């Protein structure tokens, strides 16, 4: 419920654009960005402006070339994005911020339970890998997400939409063992009830089935948390569809959206 106190707490009117980092948010993310090299040409633009520009593109759903003139040149911003994408920087920042946010919430840094689900979205003429999801009747890509019980995005992976959940779930759980080795249980829907998922790792997969008398939509235990995560990152218009020509860029934007959520949450709690 909104109150005068919460409205002031969440207000972003004092900054240039709604997607810009506040001073508190910059202090959260700055330690995780690469330091300037001791030799060579000095940076022409501060990294804070580069991050602000990337978040602006993601939040507004615009093309790189349409960046306003008060940001660094679009080509400079894109080069930084591509370098960070190839270095998996957003994934590493996301991992570090998840542990920080969990500890601020009074929980263990690494989760012991998670929820897995997928979301199919359309692609555009940009090209790249895609497929047809016969169940959702969508030609595009599928976003697989593994989130903790509070809805933080642990592992995010896009791939062609024709890959079924039972084929995409196993690799996602295997990837989680590297960053979150203490996960013991994963909740999932019936699409993951297959040995390719249940035997992929030592994580026990618990299927949360629909209610016996369920007709239409219903909020199901555990599973709603990952749906809420998709709704959270879906506020970024760049993610309304998959506009990226490569899966690597699509993955980087998914993690960047998760990082934006975590940075704001940690800054408010600090």
Residue locations for each model-derived region?
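Short alpha-helical elements
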Residues: 1-270
């Amino acid at each position: 419920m909104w109150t005068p106190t919460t409205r002031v707490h969440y207000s972003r009117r004092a900054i240039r654009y709604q997607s810009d980092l506040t001073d508190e948010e910059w202090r959260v993310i700055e330690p995780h960005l690469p330091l300037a090299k001791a030799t060579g040409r000095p940076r022409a633009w501060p990294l804070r402006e580069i991050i602000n520009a990337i978040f602006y593109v993601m939040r507004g759903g615009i093309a790189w070339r349409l960046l306003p003139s008060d940001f660094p040149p679009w080509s400079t911003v894109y080069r930084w994005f591509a370098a960070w994408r190839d270095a998996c920087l957003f994934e590493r920042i996301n991992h570090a911020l998840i542990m920080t946010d969990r500890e601020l919430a009074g929980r263990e840094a690494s989760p012991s339970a998670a929820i897995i689900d997928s979301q199919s979205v359309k692609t555009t003429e940009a090209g790249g890998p895609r497929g047809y999801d016969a169940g959702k009747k969508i030609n595009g890509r599928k976003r697989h997400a593994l989130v903790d019980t509070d809805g933080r995005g642990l592992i995010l992976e896009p791939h062609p939409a024709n890959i079924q959940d039972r084929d995409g779930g196993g690799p996602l759980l295997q990837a989680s063992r590297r960053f979150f080795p203490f996960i013991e249980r994963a909740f999932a829907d019936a699409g993951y009830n297959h040995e390719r998922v249940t035997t992929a790792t030592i994580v026990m997969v618990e299927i949360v089935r629909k209610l016996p008398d369920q007709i239409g939509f219903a909020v199901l235990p555990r599973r709603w948390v990952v749906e809420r995560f998709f709704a959270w990152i879906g506020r970024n218009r760049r993610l309304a569809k998959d506009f990226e020509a490569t899966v690597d860029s699509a993955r980087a934007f998914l993690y960047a959206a998760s990082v934006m959520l975590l940075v704001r949450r940690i800054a408010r709690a600090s």
